[in-house]
Amino acid sequence: LGLGVMGWHSFLQQKGLPFNSIASTAHTKNIFSDIRGKVEKASMDLALEYGEPLWCKGTGMRNTHLLAVAPTVSNSVIVGGISAGIEPLPANIYTFNGAKGTFIRKNKELQKILISKGEDKDQWWDQMLTEDGSAQGLPDNILTPEEKELFLTFPEINQLELVRQAAIRQRYIDQTQSLNLSFDVNDSPKWINQVHLEAWKLGIKTLYYLRTDSVIKGDLGSRMADCVSCDG
């Protein structure tokens, strides 16, 4: 058993919270501590109703394992293109190669803002598509600096922030979490090593993939073949 989550970055964007903000860190603690408390209560309630299994005798629990955060790449596409698991969105627009063809996927939260400004135009989406899905090159009269901060993509976010949020989350996860990191091909080995050491020092149990490719150059479909059994 391992209850997980999906759509973390999409949730933050819906709330208008940049991934690397203090408020996002606070939400990490509040939400995952709340999930842990409710999961434990649910397991205790099940133990009262159905009894404790032999391997849980004396614990008051029905389950030995409770939480595990899977990648959920496939599921996130199925439900409409929200962010996968706890991972930031890799791009604000990208091509998706699926079984039924190739599709263009857009960040719905970004699209809402562009629609509200009357700027949901191919011109801006085409620009982002040629810039690896980044919104940072849009004119400031189209997206303010604050809005650009909100729509930073996975490769554009400081990877130490992912690690620090994951460390907070890990306190409430009895198993582990699918934590990917993204680095530019020109990032120094020293920086990459620093991020990995920080993850170890903060008590993160595992790291999953280290990304160095662009979702635009490789399309999202190619990422979905990583691990069929755990992808979700």
Name each model feature, range by range:
Residues G7-S10, Q14, N30, D34, ...:
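Alpha-helical scaffold segments in soluble metabolic enzymes
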Residues L67-G232:
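Catalytic alpha/beta core of large soluble enzyme barrels
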Residues L3, L12-T72, P145-K148:
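Internal maturation/activation junctions in enzymes
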Residues L1-G7, L12-N30, T153, Q170-S188:
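Conserved alpha/beta enzyme-core scaffolds, especially Rossmann-like or related mixed alpha/beta domains
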Residues L1-G4, G37, T102-N107:
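Short acidic alpha-helix initiation/capping motifs at coil-to-helix transition points
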